[in-house]
Amino acid sequence: MPYVTMKQLLETGVHFGHQTRRWNPKMRPFIFGARNGIHIIDLQQTVKLYQKAHDFISNVVAGGGRVIFVGTKRQAQESVKKEAERVGQFSVTNRWMGGMLTNFQTIKKSIDRMKTLERMFEDGSIKRFPKKEIVMMGREVAKLNDNLGGIKHMDRLPQAAFIIDPKREEIAVQECRKLGIPIVAVVDTNCDPDVIDYVIPGNDDAIRAIKLFAASIAEACMEGAAQNKDVEPVADKDEKPEAAPVDEAETATETTGE
């Protein structure tokens, strides 16, 4: 898949930032101007910076590395999970549990517990427990899956993180920085770009914008996997359709969300 185009960015409303009163002054270099109290992001920079982020992710996977996709806000959950799964990468879409990376050995114990319970339900060995306990264990495995299902096959730390809305995912950003894990992030006008290694200036609230970036970064993973004979590429089951034209007023409204 080629890099994202200016046409795609415009059609999905990537240029709409947050209300001017909610901005982070550090984002000034990435802002084109303002319209009706909304900051407008400089998409020429978005195109250029996305290319760098895309190439970085592709190179990480080509080198045998793994990527964790992070997007816990409502607008991001579905597309982030779907695209990460499509290309065999990790994801966190429900909530970021403190220590998910910095205390991974403890988190891994919870993952092992989840896998054990799942096996017991699958092979029927769970039936040896009283019905009340079976119900409780069913709830436990469901909760564990909600929080950890996207990293259940993660046996070591990822080599890169792709984050939607680093302001919301502050703990994830802190953990990645502490561990030296490079961060690629869609950074809106209310975010701090200084804590991100590969900044992609753009709307992190509009569903269509999030879908575009999640799918494009997933394609970068596939490109990298195709270059690495030790990484089995995942087939692209659903060809991504070209983005449909977007009404500016409608997309601008989406930017005032979380």
UniProtKB/Swiss-Prot annotation:
Compositional bias segments (type: Basic and acidic residues): 229-242
What GO molecular functions are on record for this protein?
structural constituent of ribosome
| Comp. bias (Acidic residues) | 245-258
The identity of this protein, by name, is Small ribosomal subunit protein uS2
| Gene that encodes it | rpsB
User: What residue spans carry the region label Disordered?
Assistant: 226-258
NCBIfam families from the UniProt entry: rpsB_bact
Entry GO CC:
cytosolic small ribosomal subunit
Pfam families noted in UniProt: Ribosomal_S2
Q: Give a GO biological-process term.
A: translation
Keyword terms of this UniProt record: Ribonucleoprotein, Ribosomal protein
Cytoplasm recorded as keyword = no
Give the disulfide map: none
**Record has Ribosomal protein as a keyword:** yes
The family classification in the record reads: Belongs to the universal ribosomal protein uS2 family.
Protein source organism: Solidesulfovibrio magneticus (strain ATCC 700980 / DSM 13731 / RS-1)
